[in-house]
């Protein structure tokens, strides 16, 4: 039996998701833009999924029901790109300053880099040793020329929950976008001040290749993909009906009983962390110790997602530990899957002040509602063996 602890990279689809997708592929395959009954049937499926995902956003505390419009696209990366580049270009006549943090997902940072090449002024907000943004710096950077602020809700490498509600309250006349890919259906906390919210299906046990961008009513952005004007003209191209249907089912199921499910995940995460601390010496915990479902919170504020735990095993290489665990049927990550195949250290851990050696030994364990205490015993046992073996070999060099 495998132990899958790479749920921040992707998740296993719910069986109900696969079932509805198969039905759409076999029976409900009409083009939703067609004027016949098969087209209407597909359009109805999209409408229902939009309602399901919108309701899940509301349950997650990310937006209030009825405040905006949600349109489907290919995933979190496209959502981030569209929000950032679309908003910046639509509001350029009001200013040219854009603000984000050093710890964002590459989909955000690369969008900002492209806009900088096009003449926009970019400000990067620093983070502390817990990966939390410097609020004082953010406040000082916002001025009358600021047209967009983009800050993620939950960091995908450390699980740190950013104070986005507090940050959004400082926005003045700027638009505020949050990448909520790792928060959706996992961390219930209000970001009602956000103007745009990016989410993804495959992080919540839905299909890959589909995501959504929620936009508050009255906000106009320039679409990146032009054509037939689908998705209320925000995202042209024939909709991926099976994936959208699967996304709707996944959002409905993942958001149902979310608090109780995530409390269980938090308990498993805590058990794993305590086991590692007890059995393995010379580690650095890169995630805040306590999740948003535990009592020990800083000033009453949640610190970390219950799903993510990032630890550096000093004197080792994360990639070697990863493959050692893989041989035992345990699957973890050394960082974000979007960039973990590159031979560069994590930009997030570097911004937190970790040395190259500390970053090199980092492992990310990301849990889901299906992980168990018994699995964590197996993980700790095999992890200790792998770390001890590597350190012993290293000392013989």
Give the ranges of each region predicted by the language model.
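Pyridoxal 5′-phosphate
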Residues: 1-397
């Amino acid at each position: 039996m495998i132990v899958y602890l790479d749920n921040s990279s992707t998740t296993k689809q719910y069986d109900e998701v696969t079932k509805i997708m198969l039905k759409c592929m076999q029976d409900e395959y009409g083009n939703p833009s067609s004027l016949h009954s098969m087209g209407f049937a597909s359009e109805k499926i999209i409408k229902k999924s939009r309602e399901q995902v919108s309701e899940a956003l509301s349950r997650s505390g990310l937006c209030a029901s009825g405040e905006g419009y949600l349109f489907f696209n290919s995933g979190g990366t496209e959502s981030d790109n569209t929000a950032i580049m679309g908003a910046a270009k639509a509001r350029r006549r009001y200013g040219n300053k854009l603000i984000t943090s050093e710890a964002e997902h590459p989909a955000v940072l690369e969008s900002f880099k492209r806009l900088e090449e096009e003449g926009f002024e970019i400000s990067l907000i620093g983070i502390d040793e817990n990966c939390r943004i410097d609020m004082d710096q953010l406040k000082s950077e916002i001025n009358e020329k600021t047209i967009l602020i983009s800050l993620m809700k939950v960091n995908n490498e450390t699980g740190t929950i950013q104070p986005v509600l507090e940050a959004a309250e400082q926005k003045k006349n700027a638009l505020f976008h949050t990448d909520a890919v790792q928060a959706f259906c996992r961390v219930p906390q209000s970001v009602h001040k956000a103007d745009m919210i990016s989410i993804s299906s495959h992080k919540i046990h839905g299909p890959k290749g589909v995501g959504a961008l929620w936009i508050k009513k009255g906000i106009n952005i320039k679409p990146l993909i032009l054509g037939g004007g689908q998705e209320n003209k925000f995202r042209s191209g024939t909709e991926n009906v099976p994936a959208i249907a699967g996304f709707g089912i996944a959002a409905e199921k993942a958001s149902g009983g979310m608090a109780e499910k995530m409390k269980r995940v938090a308990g498993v995460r805590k058990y794993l962390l305590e086991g590692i601390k007890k059995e393995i010496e010379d580690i650095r915990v890169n995630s805040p110790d306590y999740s948003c479902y535990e009592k020990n919170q800083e000033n009453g504020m949640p610190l970390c997602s219950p799903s993510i735990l990032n630890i550096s095993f000093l004197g080792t290489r994360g990639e070697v530990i990863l493959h050692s665990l893989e041989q035992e049927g345990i699957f973890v990550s050394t960082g974000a899957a979007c960039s973990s195949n590159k031979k560069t250290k994590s930009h997030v851990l570097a911004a937190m002040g970790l040395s190259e050696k500390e970053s090199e030994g980092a492992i990310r364990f990301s849990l889901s509602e299906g992980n168990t205490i018994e699995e964590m015993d197996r993980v700790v046992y095999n992890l200790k063996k792998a770390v001890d073996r590597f350190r012993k070999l290293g000392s013989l060099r």
